[in-house]
From Swiss-Prot:
It catalyses: UMP + diphosphate = 5-phospho-alpha-D-ribose 1-diphosphate + uracil. 5-phospho-alpha-D-ribose 1-diphosphate binds at R78, R103, D130, P131, M132, L133, A134, T135, G136, V137, S138, D199. Pfam families: UPRTase. This is Uracil phosphoribosyltransferase. The keyword Membrane does not apply. The gene is upp. Allosterically activated by GTP. It comes from Thermosipho africanus (strain TCF52B).
């Protein structure tokens, strides 16, 4: 499977706190942002760097820069919103789009209800953000949408992934690289990841 689990002590520590039932929404939001930043450190290694000449206090030298104006961040509403600031802290000039998708509770099919994306071209580097890669149908739908808008270079950043969802994404979008903090055991009969952390959106926004 085309998936990179970012194995780091800080991520394991913070993710453990997020999983706990008694972790409140404020701490949950802060941890999601922090873990996303740590995952993004690895996920952004695919970005193209450009050579330039700079002047230090002592002499001229060669340097490098990333043109983050070519970067597009696309959180899947609503839980993906909690991941945006983590990447924007690293790439503050990136464009941000939004895709609204909900999972139909009976069929578990992905239904699009909103899509607002900035200009995307073949040189754009698109990060799709989805905290929980469960059945994979929402992520696949979002990947379909960004590719329909012209995206060629796409990375899926997720907090927790299931083996089932990872296989679905790999089958439908074999060119997309997945970065995650954890590959969990399995899905339950309702399509939730086990052991997981529950519904990320509900925990972020305290809607249950």
């Amino acid at each position: 499977m085309k998936i990179n689990v970012v194995d780091h002590p800080l991520i394991k520590h913070k993710l453990t706190i997020m999983r706990k039932t008694d972790t409140g929404p404020k701490e949950f939001r802060e941890l999601l942002k922090e873990i996303t930043l740590l995952i993004a450190y690895e996920a952004t290694r695919h970005l193209e760097i450009h050579e330039t000449e700079i002047e230090t206090p002592l002499e001229k030298t060669k340097g490098y820069f990333i043109d983050d104006k070519d970067v597009v961040i696309v959180p899947i509403l609503r839980a993906g919103l909690g991941m945006s600031d983590g990447i924007l802290q690293l790439l503050p000039n990136a464009s941000v789009g939004h895709i609204g998708i909900y999972r139909e509770p009976h069929t578990l099919e992905a239904v699009e209800y909103y899509a607002k994306l900035p200009k995307i071209n073949e040189n754009s580097f698109v990060f799709v953000l989805d905290p929980m890669l469960a059945t994979g149908v929402s992520s696949v739908k979002a990947l379909d949408i960004v590719k329909e808008h012209g995206a060629k270079n796409v990375i899926l950043v997720t907090l927790i992934a299931s083996p089932e969802g990872t296989r679905v994404v790999n089958d439908k979008h074999p060119d997309v690289i997945i970065y995650t903090a954890s590959l969990d055991r399995e899905l339950n009969s309702k399509g939730y990841i086990l052991p997981g952390l529950g519904d990320a959106g509900d925990r972020l926004f305290r809607t249950k």
